[in-house]
A protein has these predicted regions:
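A cross-kingdom signal targeting lumenal/periplasmic-facing segments of multi-pass membrane
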Residues: 1-50, 58-63, 67, 71-89, ...
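Active-site-proximal, structured, solvent-exposed surfaces of multi-pass membrane proteins
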Residues: 84-357
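Intrinsic-disorder/low-complexity, polar/charged segments
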Residues: 51-53, 57, 240, 262
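Short, solvent-exposed cationic patches
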Residues: 54-55, 64-66, 318-321
Length: 357
């Protein structure tokens, strides 16, 4: 994980070993290694069905991935994951130019702030989770309260009315940004509405405000744009890290060894003390083919994006090859098309020669 020197607070939990430094554009960057990192091939002794995993929250999913492999089905036992995340109550304190009404935050001044005040837990990562977020811009007239409007001169009112006539709701309501600050960290939530040409439908966000030994006390939201920010749910969740080391140690205990990758092929060997599932940290694709002890073996899609092999107790030789899907069929069809073209040209030339004769 690479960060600018002096900004180590952006490092996720566990990235505490400095392995390299480099300078670019007069800035020093540092690369840190995670002590709990898993190898390219690690093993599980239990699984979690995909349909159950799909119903979990984002915070639950990251905990589940350390307790069981995610598969549609498996021969290893199913496990029921345990979760230790805690939602903590908070008080929302709004600043100048920002007010809360009917579950919405109405911002009438750029860079207005709201603060979530809470008692966070020690030795935790603290998350701000927002669901169903949407944004609507406010017109120049809507930014002015009735009390202030009545005090304005006729000229000032006419000026605002003119600005209002040229203002376009669909254009101004396309996107907005919220800066999230948790003690030292500063991150940004980018909101793109259905009026934006690159709208993706995303309205739920999880912002990790970082790990801290002492519990955090507040999270500050800074609204770069004026407008109405609505949300269905907003919560602060603390994720203790007490189980991470023991869980990753278990996954690393029996891993793929003597790994070699060359010529579209990965090889290695592994010994497992009981029936297990070996996860290969390569993106799943139908182009991969696996062989265990020389026997062709089914590769399963695991943990959403990776590949997995079911292994029996014992020592095994693993070989995984890759060939681009439909590459051979494509070559055959290309050659066939080329032959057809040559035949057409030859027939055409022969007919043309016959006419001249």
């Amino acid at each position: 994980f690479v960060v600018k020197a002096g900004e180590e607070e952006y490092l996720p939990y566990g990235y505490d070993t400095l392995v390299a430094e480099a300078e670019k554009n007069d800035r020093l960057y540092r690369a840190y290694e995670c002590k709990n990192a898993l190898s390219i091939g690690y093993t599980y002794d239990s699984y979690i069905p995909e349909e159950k995993y799909a119903k979990m929250s984002t915070v639950e999913k990251q905990q589940a991935l350390l307790q069981g492999v995610i598969l549609s089905d498996s021969t290893v036992p199913e496990t029921i994951p345990e979760f230790n995340d805690r939602e903590v109550p908070y008080k929302l304190v709004t600043g100048s130019g920002c007010r809360e009404k009917d579950g919405k935050l109405i911002v009438t001044k750029e860079n207005a702030q709201a603060k979530l005040v809470f008692d966070g837990l020690d030795e935790c990562e603290t998350y701000l989770i927002t669901e169903g977020v949407d944004y609507e811009a406010l017109s120049p007239r809507e930014l002015i309260s009735d009390k202030k409007w009545n005090k304005m001169t006729l000229y000032e009112q006419k000026k605002v009315q003119y600005e209002n006539s040229t203002w376009r709701y669909w254009k101004e309501s396309q996107k907005a940004y919220i800066d999230v600050t948790g003690q030292f960290l500063d991150k940004t939530i980018s909101i793109f509405t259905d009026k934006y040409n690159a709208y993706s439908g995303r309205s739920d966000f999880l912002c990790n405000t970082g790990y801290s030994v002492k519990g955090k006390k507040s999270i500050t939201l800074t609204f770069e744009n004026t407008g109405v920010y609505s949300y269905k749910n907003m919560k602060v969740v603390c994720q203790p890290i007490e189980n991470i080391e023991s869980q990753t140690t278990k996954l690393r205990a029996e891993s793929l060894e003597n790994v070699e990758i060359k010529n579209h092929e990965l090889t290695g060997n592994i010994s497992v003390s009981k029936d297990k599932v070996l996860v290969i940290s390569l993106p799943y694709s139908k182009g991969f083919q696996a062989y265990v002890d020389g026997q062709k073996t089914e590769l399963k899609q695991a943990n959403t994006m990776y590949m997995a092999l079911e292994l029996k107790k014992g020592t095994h030789e693993i070989r995984i090859t890759y060939c681009t899907p439909y590459l051979k069929a494509g070559l055959v069809l290309t050659c066939a098309g080329l032959l057809c073209y040559i035949c057409v040209v030859l027939v055409y030339k022969k007919k043309r020669g016959s006419k001249k004769g």
